[in-house]
Amino acid sequence: MIPGEILTDDGEHELNAGRATLSLVVANTGDRPVQVGSHYHFFEVNDALSFDRAAARGFRLNIAAGTAVRFEPGQTRTVELVALAGERAVYGFQGKVMGPL
């Protein structure tokens, strides 16, 4: 085994199976690119991103761990979010929650 190597079974694997998801239209209203990582609490992303923030509370991007989505200035795109799992408490990021969801 190589450090960091991931060994999986053959076939397809569904990420985040059975978890609540939602789609949101997101626009970068700023003049610089914004990149959002896979596990960032989407409610607390850069304020230059315009979308229904209240709907995004408790959700993150529904993408593979360690990846990110980049929003270029003026770009609008639809993203799929997935509900946070585990204890459903958020600490850090921009400090807008700092506790249970």
From Swiss-Prot:
Keywords from the UniProt entry: Cytoplasm, Hydrolase
EC number: 3.5.1.5
CDD domains for this protein: Urease_beta (cd00407)
Pfam families: Urease_beta
Broad enzyme group: hydrolase
Record-linked Gene3D superfamilies: Urease, beta subunit
One GO BP annotation of this record: urea catabolic process
Domain of life assignment: Bacteria
Annotated localization: Cytoplasm
Catalyzed reactions: urea + 2 H2O + H(+) = hydrogencarbonate + 2 NH4(+)
Any one cellular-component term (Gene Ontology): urease complex
Pathway(s) served: Nitrogen metabolism; urea degradation; CO(2) and NH(3) from urea (urease route): step 1/1
GO terms, molecular function: urease activity
NCBIfam families: PRK13203.1, urease_beta
Subunit-structure text: Heterotrimer of UreA (gamma), UreB (beta) and UreC (alpha) subunits. Three heterotrimers associate to form the active enzyme.
Protein family according to the UniProt entry: Belongs to the urease beta subunit family.
Alphabetical list of HAMAP family matching this protein: Urease_beta (MF_01954)
Protein name (record): Urease subunit beta
Taxonomic source organism: Burkholderia cenocepacia (strain HI2424)
